[in-house]
Design a protein with these regions (language model features):
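Short, glycine-/small-residue-rich phosphate/pyrophosphate-handling segment
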Residues: 92, 105-151
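Active-site rim beta-loop-alpha module in soluble metabolic enzymes
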Residues: 155-156
Length: 186
């Protein structure tokens, strides 16, 4: 079983990356193969909105999004990980979500059987961010509601997530729940 985390934070040592690592570490300890893709380390251009993808099997832009989306297709479980920036997902995560437009145009869905969401905010807008991610999940995955696992909370400065033990535990629990869910329905 393979679980892939896609991280929308540009901070490699920030709170959200730390929590993604916690979830993946727990999943790995339970036997899952894990991978983490930090979007800021790749070239993922924004959607150009030209609608040409309706005529093709994938986006015509030649950047790293195609490779990342292929990894997404192969995963049994996916974790969407983002900080809240200006009341919603980060720009990196938004660009990635928008590049999935071709799925909608071709009435396709990813095969992942479980999805996790990790969101960290400084002080507010977690609900708005969750709404955006759930909308993406609804359009892009054929996953039942009880197979979507969420860990979210608050952390202001770099390193604050490590001190927020309930949030760390929630991230680890998310990794565990994903593995258990994949095992029980395989």
């Amino acid at each position: 079983m393979k679980i892939l985390a896609v991280v929308g934070s540009p901070r490699l040592k920030g709170n959200i990356n730390y929590l993604a690592d916690q979830a993946l570490e727990e999943a790995q300890e339970l036997g899952a193969e894990t991978e983490k893709i930090v979007l800021s380390q790749y070239e993922v251009n924004p959607c150009l909105g030209h609608d040409d993808c309706a005529s093709f099997e994938s986006c015509l832009q030649k950047d790293d999004a195609g490779w990342i989306l292929d990894r997404f297709r192969e995963a049994d479980g996916v974790i969407l990980v983002t900080p809240v920036y200006w009341y919603n997902v980060s720009a990196q995560m938004k660009a990635f979500i928008d590049r999935n437009y071709f799925l909608y145009k071709h009435d396709q869905k990813y095969k992942a059987r479980v999805v996790g969401i990790i969101v960290v905010a400084e002080m507010e807008a977690i609900e708005d961010t969750l709404h955006t991610l759930k909308q993406f999940i609804d359009w892009s995955f054929d996953v039942e509601e009880d197979r979507i696992f969420i860990a979210c909370g608050y952390a202001h400065k770099m390193g604050d997530a490590k001190k927020n033990l309930p949030l760390v535990e929630d991230a680890r629990k998310l990794g565990k729940q994903m593995v258990e869910s994949l095992r029980e329905r395989s």
